[in-house]
Amino acid sequence: RQQQIALGGEAMAQGRAAKLLRPGAREADVATVAAGMRRLRRDGYLAAAWMLAHDDIHCWLADYRGRLSVWCGEQDAITQPELAQGVALRYGAPYIAIPQAGHASYLDNEIFFNQQLLRIGEEVRDECTN
């Protein structure tokens, strides 16, 4: 990760932006991801990358008592869908595969992603009013 960030935001954006999306992603979506990568700050990026590589999500989820669902793009090359499914199974949570989507599923399939957000909002609203 340090090598990636040492090359600079522009080089990282050029080399990695498309990998966060599904194969054949829209150029506008690749440009959106690349623009975000160009704005990354070295220390923040390295801290986040370290946490993702070294922290154990199970330590956090073992004590979690709230509602949980696991979402993953069907074509995610960063977080493998099989591993996301395993997390859902382990914690008895629903697994939602986001069709035609990579890691940045909110860009690849924004309609499906937003429908899921709206569904959750309705569930929470219904809980609060019943």
Tell me what each language-model feature is:
Residues 77-83:
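Conserved alpha/beta-hydrolase "acid-adjacent" motif
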Residues 6-63:
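Conserved alpha/beta-hydrolase catalytic His-Asp/Glu region
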Residues 50, 69, 94-96:
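Structural signal for short hydrophobic segments within the conserved structured cores
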Residues 91-130:
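Catalytic active-site module of serine/aspartate enzymes centered on a nucleophile-bearing elbow/loop
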Residues 63-64, 70-72, 76:
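Short beta-strand/loop motif that positions the catalytic acidic residue
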